[in-house]
Amino acid sequence: MALLREGHRCIVGIDEVGRGAWAGPVVAGAVAVPPEIYANPLVLSDADDSKRVPARRRQALADEILSVTSTAIGWVDAWLMDALGASEATHLAMRTAVTALASTTRDGAIDGPGWHARRASGVARSAEILLIDGYPIGNPPAPQRAIVRGDRECLAIACASLVAKVARDTFMTALAHPFPDYGFDRNVGYGTRDHFGALIAHGLTPLHRRRFQPMRHLDQCSSAHAPALPSPTRTAPTGRGQLGFLDGWDTL
């Protein structure tokens, strides 16, 4: 890899999941892949853009990524997305993930109003350069290079895409229990015909992004809302791999 030949030793890939969803947080993964992994074609050989990896394979791949890399997850809640807008909220999730990756506390935990980040695996790593899928982010915490289709072309970005996808899907699927009418275990917060029907029938939840359509229109037309979101548990569910800790996210 050219960046390794240039002398960079901590190359961090970043990608987001959930920017275009109707409900739930936007989530960013930040992954520092050790140089020796690039030299071994047998390790992480199936890592790819999370949209191209079958759902049944994502959890196993995410667990493999966590076992050999330093990884952090950052997320921004729906209400803060409404306040900041999708682009700035996504950039904030990415920046906090990189900051948590470098934090020397036990789990790299950092939090603010409506945003949170944790290190999910590995030791603290301070990025020398950031590789980002698509477009540059504002106020990056390290020098950055944006790569078009980076989640398909760059191992570190593909890894970030996968862990962010698994983390967010795990979280949204767990919310199908307190909010059974919205099909979060199937749509993970994205827009579908059934999801729209649930919004018409039951109103908006605190997870829904009121600045986004069609929620903005529905919010203006009706004052009916679903009950408040229950306090999240701090117990990781069984059978969800190493990303089960994300069930403890504070979502409001």
Language model segments and positions:
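RNase H-like, Mg2+-dependent phosphodiesterase core
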Residues: 1-252
